Swiss-Prot record:
Residues 56-70, 171-184, 778-827 have a biased composition (Low complexity). It holds the Pfam family Fungal_trans. It comes from Candida albicans (strain SC5314 / ATCC MYA-2876) (Yeast). Residues 13-27 have a biased composition (Pro residues). GO terms for biological process: biological process involved in interaction with host; cellular response to alkaline pH; DNA repair; DNA-templated transcription; filamentous growth; intracellular iron ion homeostasis; positive regulation of filamentous growth of a population of unicellular organisms in response to biotic stimulus; regulation of cellular response to iron ion starvation. CDD domains: fungal_TF_MHR (cd12148), GAL4 (cd00067). Transmembrane segments: none annotated. Keywords: Coiled coil, Cytoplasm, DNA-binding, Iron, Metal-binding, Nucleus, Phosphoprotein, Transcription, Transcription regulation, Virulence, Zinc. This is Transcriptional regulatory protein SEF1. SUPFAM superfamilies: Zn2/Cys6 DNA-binding domain (SSF57701). Induction: Expression is regulated by changes of iron conditions with an increase in low iron. Transcription is negatively regulated by SFU1. GO terms for cellular component: cytoplasm; nucleus.
């Protein structure tokens, strides 16, 4: 602010020398004259003009009137007249509003400046700055410091700039030689630019200074532009900002270089294929996304690379992105919504992991949740200023994307907690979550997904968070009533949402349905309450398998989000448990086995280049294969549980909520492993009962096999393997050279026809194995089986009554097996079951095969696998049975040799701590 009036003189203490009568006395009432003159009328009078002229003359003639006046130095400049009272305090004391004696101590400094060693200066034009201005200056200084730190620490960028400058100078002067110009040419940059953001100082980790190297780099001459501190996706989407984006020719992360055109292809692939599963970001180009957030950009590129025929790019980026996330989120606390969105994407399409504890997705979700709370995402954009003071240029849609990010964090928290069997840390809803139920601006699928996750949170809070029991579960006697109410509420929610059938939302709805059934199957629940949910669990699981089997026709399994893949995994584990249970209806057993085989082949039938990738898909396939080996080697582990009349469907685990199903099956694998170690070197006794194993083959790839999937009218998905022409020709050539049966990747060719159904065993058995009193084996068309429809609602209600009468029927079966069998055979229409015996002498009573395997006294052995008529004619039964047996013996050789280390699926389960019961 400029002053229109002259500055008041500041004089030292009065001296004995006579003063000029025209000079006003300093710091005395004489000072009031100019103040009073200011208050007078602005009309010019001769008297006023004469006073002003005298005052200006006296001011100009006074040597001590210059300003700013440093104490002890004569003033050297004049100032405009002000008319205010003279300034007697130094600038420091005026800024802090404290008493100052600078005028009294002149020419010495005031007491405070003298004590603090400051330069005491009196400046009438100085005006104290406001607090907000100081804060703004501090922000500017911090930003400058960050830029300086980046330039000083980043040697490569400075070297590149200097070399570029020298090269230009040399080319202009044309004085340097070829070798000198080559030295001056910028080298192929081994850029180690660390990840920088608008809210964290740059981090550069050199190889000789830190064990964690920086992995981020970008090839561009201009310095890196900082992200918008608003952190909202739409803040950079204005036309002005798009024009200001720095052009980027290629993107570099560690040793991975991605050209711009390739980055745009992967960016568009993600936006069209993957983003609809969880629409939480908006982006128009790869360059725009990179300028928003490097971590978000690379997370999108990593996810889109799942569609590549070769996993080279995906595997190269996986470890680098994990390191980048550590640099971004742990070394410095990010304040960016984009970082939260990147963590969500990395949790929905997880990084490669071999064991459960190796999966860092749950930690990413927890970090995203904590950052969201710190940034105020749970309170919406209306209160953003209460959580951050540096929000800049909020876009018109910033609140929308911030809200979607918070909704996605809530969904991921509920899903991953259920997957791991942990109570969710977000166990209550808020305004944004409740409003999302009716918010029509949200995409329908996303809104339905959030509504289902809210119900999922309620389900776990009611059934799995209790303070009256150490396992946290609801009292067993109260579970049936609560589950019945929750099941009806879920059905009302389905009617209200009206989601599309056969889509991802129905898959997640059925997954929650299975969670309700799992709570009913936990130990302690009365048996009569468990059997009510057996049919519901079977129908939900087979429906999930059918839907996903159709979805993979349009998108590969590995590209599906984790919440769909986990639904399939949970379904196959549920079916595996149910098909060994005494409570599953007989006619559902074959269908359950075929669905299990379908899922295993779906998980294993991938491209050969991707077969070594370790993730949740490969882990599920390994668990199924190990469970199948338990069926083959130690069937008593399952039989003992099934024969116990009081045992639950889930027999042991209960403290992992709905994940207890997975841990219960893993216990069976570890128990079989423990027994194999104890039986090493001993002659293994043949079990009295042997369960027909499932036709699992882990050597199947899309290069050698094609899968043909069909769905019967009753909802059963059946998958058969068909070898490719190339694989068939190679198998024939090997078989001709070695005079061995046809095999493809070690799999006998006749075994490819097996789909998991036990009826195939009946069709392949020779007539000599049938007992004399049994009817002859007849062939029945498959159309009769396909005419079975899904059980109606009345049949599901009758199922509980059938299960309650089951024990009485079993007792009568044991007392009069022959009469019971004849009665069942006569009452049935054209028979779908048949009686066979393990040995010709009929040492065991007859049984009903296939549709109710475990309650019987005999199960088919491995040598009764499916055989085509051609194989029967060419080969005898014994060589073929030996071939099948050798196949499974080779797969289980690790159990007996104690060299199989692939059964530690959890990463922490110690089998030596589990005592045999």
């Amino acid at each position: 602010m400029k002053f229109e009036k002259g500055k008041v003189r500041i004089l030292p203490k009065p001296s004995p020398t006579p003063t000029n009568p025209q000079t006003p006395l300093p710091l005395l009432p004489a000072q009031t004259k100019p103040v009073n003159s200011k208050r007078k009328s602005a009309a010019s009078t001769p008297g006023n003009e004469s006073k002003k002229s005298r005052k200006s003359n006296s001011t100009a003639s006074t040597p001590n009137s210059a300003t700013p006046t440093s104490v002890g130095t004569p003033p050297q400049k004049t100032s405009k007249p002000t008319g205010h009272r003279p300034v007697t305090s130094c600038t420091f004391c005026r800024q802090h509003k404290i008493k100052c004696n600078a005028s009294d101590n002149y020419p010495n400094p005031c007491e405070r400046c003298k004590k603090m060693g400051l330069k005491c200066e009196i400046d009438p034009e100085f005006r104290p700055r406001k607090g907000s201005q100081i804060q703004s200056l501090k922000s500017d200084v911090d930003e400058l410091k960050a830029k300086i730190e980046m330039l000083t620490k980043n040697e490569s960028l400075l070297t590149q700039a200097l070399n570029q400058h020298n090269l230009n100078h040399a080319s202009q002067q044309q004085q340097s030689s070829g070798s000198q110009s080559q030295q001056q040419h910028p080298p192929n940059p081994q850029r180690a630019l660390s990840y920088t953001s608008a809210n964290s100082s740059p981090q550069v980790a050199f190889s000789n200074a830190s064990p964690i190297p920086s992995v981020t780099s970008i090839q561009q001459n201009a310095p890196l532009t900082h992200e918008n501190s608003d952190n909202s996706p739409y803040a950079l989407n204005t036309p002005e900002n798009i024009e200001e984006l720095q052009p980027i020719s290629e993107f570099i992360l560690g040793d991975v270089t991605l050209p711009l055109n390739r980055a745009n292809e992967l960016h568009d692939k993600f936006m069209t294929t993957h983003l609809p599963f969880l629409p939480i970001i908006i982006s128009r180009s790869a360059t725009e996304l990179y300028h928003k957030s490097q971590l978000l950009f690379w997370a999108v590129i990593l996810t889109a690379s799942l569609s590549e025929p070769e996993p080279k790019l995906y595997m190269s980026l996986a470890s680098l992105i994990k390191q980048l996330a550590i640099e971004t989120c742990w070394i410095k606390t990010p304040r960016s919504t984009h970082v939260i969105q990147a963590l969500i994407i990395l949790s929905i399409w997880p990084l490669p992991n071999e064991k459960v504890l190796d999966d860092c997705s749950y930690r990413f979700v927890g970090l995203a949740k904590n950052l969201s709370l710190q940034l105020g995402l749970h309170r919406g954009g209306e209160f953003i200023q209460e959580f951050s003071r540096n929000q800049v240029s909020l876009g018109p849609d910033a609140e929308r994307w911030r809200t979607r990010s918070w909704l996605a964090v809530f969904f991921c928290e509920q899903f991953w907690s259920s997957l791991l069997g942990l109570p969710p840390s977000i166990n209550t809803t808020d305004y944004l979550l409740e409003n999302a139920r009716v918010d029509k601006s949200l995409p329908k699928n996303f809104r339905c997904l959030i509504s289902l996750s809210i119900f999922q949170c309620k389900l776990v809070n009611i059934m799995g968070i209790s303070v009256t029991r150490p396992d946290g579960l609801l009292e067993p006697s109260n579970r049936a009533g609560s589950l019945s109410l929750l099941d009806r509420e879920l059905e009302r929610l389905r009617f209200k949402l009206q989601f599309e059938e056969g889509g991802p939302i129905e898959v997640y709805y059925l997954y929650i349905k299975l969670m309700i059934c799992c709570f009913a199957f936990l130990p302690g629940t009365p048996i009569e309450d468990q059997v009510k949910y057996v049919s519901f669990a079977y129908l939900s699981a087979t429906r999930i398998v059918t839907i996903v089997s159709k979805m993979v026709n349009d998108i590969s399994l590995i590209e599906l989000p984790i919440y769909i893949r986990q639904a399939v995994t949970y379904s196959v584990f549920m079916l595996f448990k149910l098909h060994l249970s005494r409570y599953l209806i007989d006619k559902y057993v074959d269908s359950a086995r075929q669905s299990i085989v379908t899922v295993h082949r779906l998980f294993r039938n991938t491209l050969s280049s991707w077969k070594d990738l370790q993730n949740d898909i490969s882990r599920t396939a390994k668990v199924l294969e190990n469970l199948n080996m338990v069926l083959y080697n130690y069937p008593e582990i399952f039989l003992n549980d099934s024969e116990n009349e009081d045992s639950s469907i889930i027999t042991r685990m209960r403290s992992h909520l709905t994940a207890s199903l997975f841990y219960d099956l893993v216990w069976c694998v570890h128990e079989a492993r423990r027994r194999s170690v104890l039986d090493k070197g001993k002659r293994q006794a043949q079990p009295n009962k042997k369960i027909l194993p499932l036709p699992f083959y882990n050597q199947i790839t899309k290069d050698d096999f094609k899968t043909i999937t069909t769905t019967s009218p009753n909802g059963t998905t059946i998958t058969t393997l068909v070898p490719t022409d190339q694989a068939m020709n190679q198998a024939k050539s090997k078989s001709f050279d070695s005079s061995k049966p046809l095999e493809i990747n070690g799999i006998p060719l006749p075994m490819l026809e097996a789909t998991g159904s036990t009826r195939e065993v009946l069709d392949s058995l020779p007539s000599q194995s049938l007992p004399s009193q049994a009817p002859t084996l007849q062939q029945y068309p498959m159309q009769q089986d396909q005419q079975q429809q899904e059980p109606s609602q009345q049949q599901q209600q009758k199922h509980s009554q059938q299960s309650q009468q089951y024990q009485q029927q079993q007792q009568s079966n044991q007392q009069q097996p022959h009469l019971q069998h004849q009665r069942q055979f006569q009452q049935s229409p054209p028979p779908q079951f048949s009686m066979i015996s393990s040995t010709p002498p009929l040492q065991q009573p007859p049984f009903i095969l296939a549709n109710s395997p475990l309650p019987q006294t005999y199960l088919p052995k491995i040598d009764e696998m499916n055989m085509s008529p051609e194989v029967k004619q060419e080969n005898s039964v014994a060589p073929f049975a030996s071939q099948i047996t050798n196949f499974f013996d080779q797969q289980t050789s690790g159990w007996f040799n104690n060299d199989n280390q692939d059964d530690d699926f959890l990463g922490w389960f110690d089998v030596n701590m589990m005592q045999e019961k």
